[in-house]
Amino acid sequence: SKTPIRVAVTGAAGNIGYHLLFRIA
């Protein structure tokens, strides 16, 4: 079972990383 906090943190980190990658590329 995944904890809501872990899912939120992972989702936020993934979203930020994706946006940064898109910006750099």
From Swiss-Prot:
Belongs to the LDH/MDH superfamily. MDH type 2 family. The lineage of its organism: Bacteria, Pseudomonadati, Pseudomonadota, Alphaproteobacteria, Caulobacterales. NAD(+) binds at G11, A12, A13, G14, N15, I16, G17. Its EC number is 1.1.1.37. GO terms for biological process: tricarboxylic acid cycle. Keywords: NAD, Oxidoreductase, Tricarboxylic acid cycle. InterPro entries: NAD(P)-bd_dom_sf (IPR036291). It comes from the Bacteria. It catalyses: (S)-malate + NAD(+) = oxaloacetate + NADH + H(+). Catalyzes the reversible oxidation of malate to oxaloacetate. The keyword Nucleus does not apply. One of its GO terms (molecular function) is L-malate dehydrogenase (NAD+) activity. It is an enzyme of class 1 (oxidoreductase). This is Malate dehydrogenase.
